[in-house]
């Protein structure tokens, strides 16, 4: 893993955005894996501020709630339109269909689509319990796109987007860990002290289903971008190297 520790959350978002921008610039066709939740919002704002040309980019999102139509205000389809797609046109954009009549069949369809496209770069966040996408603790490390039941901690974390906890869906369609690992490059962003324990396990623990993000250690092209709070439980030597790496990142681009 290549770990960068930025001074602020905004700097961490800027690093991740810059990496994405550099990868897609000048390419004829590019497949970009996108995420939802609070982590990527600042980056999507940067896409809009720069009017980044994504006309040659096909996007695939990690997951979608089951039971919500694409136009439901809390669906991830609506999230992506409101925060990115309505202002930054992509060549094509794909998400799982949350209101598909057969979620299992939809998961299989989406797995096939993602595999055929081939993801060049996948953007990730990480949950407090170490989940990536909706791969909760206990998910098989070789899981493909599947239907998953959300843990109470994940539903509670997403409660802020709904009127009541009871309104938060209980299931979702998510890319599996094996699906994510098939991306050519991965950029994971984590900020804030609430993510510190999960980040520590992701980097320092042996790969385990108890902390799904630990599987990323086996990927040859992972960049982890943190702020100081998210890195605070990692070894001091790693924090120091990460801070130096973040400083170099900005210096060579000035």
Curated annotation (Swiss-Prot):
SUPFAM superfamilies: NagB/RpiA/CoA transferase-like. Its EC number is 3.5.99.6. It is an enzyme of class 3 (hydrolase). GO terms for cellular component: cytoplasm. Transmembrane segments: none annotated. GO terms for molecular function: glucosamine-6-phosphate deaminase activity; identical protein binding. CDD domains: GlcN6P_deaminase. Belongs to the glucosamine/galactosamine-6-phosphate isomerase family. NagB subfamily. Catalyzes the reversible isomerization-deamination of glucosamine 6-phosphate (GlcN6P) to form fructose 6-phosphate (Fru6P) and ammonium ion. This is Glucosamine-6-phosphate deaminase. The gene is nagB.
């Amino acid at each position: 893993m290549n770990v960068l520790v930025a001074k602020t959350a905004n700097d961490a978002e800027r690093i991740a955005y810059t990496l994405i921008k550099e990868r897609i610039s000048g390419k004829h066709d590019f497949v970009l894996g996108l995420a939802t939740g609070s982590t990527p919002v600042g980056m999507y704002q940067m896409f809009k501020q720069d009017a980044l040309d994504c006309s040659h980019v096909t996007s695939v999102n990690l997951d979608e709630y089951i039971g919500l139509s694409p136009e439901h205000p809390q669906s991830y389809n609506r999230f992506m339109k409101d925060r990115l797609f309505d202002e930054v046109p992509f060549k094509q954009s794909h998400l799982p269909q949350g209101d598909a009549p057969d979620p299992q069949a939809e998961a299989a369809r989406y797995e096939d689509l993602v595999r055929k496209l081939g993801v060049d770069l996948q953007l990730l966040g990480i949950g407090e319990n170490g989940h990536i996408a909706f791969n909760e603790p206990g998910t098989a490390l070789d899981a493909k796109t599947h239907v998953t039941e959300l843990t109470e901690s994940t539903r509670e974390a997403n409660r802020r987007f709904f009127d009541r906890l009871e309104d938060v869906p209980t299931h979702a369609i998510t890319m599996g860990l094996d699906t994510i690992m098939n991306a050519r490059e991965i950029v994971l962003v984590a900020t804030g002290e609430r993510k510190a324990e999960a980040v520590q396990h992701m980097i320092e623990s042996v790969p385990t289903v108890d902390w799904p993000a630990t599987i990323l250690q086996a990927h040859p092209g992972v960049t982890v971008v943190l702020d100081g709070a998210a890195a605070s439980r990692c070894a001091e030597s790693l924090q120091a190297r990460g801070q130096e790496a973040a400083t170099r990142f900005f210096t060579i681009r000035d």
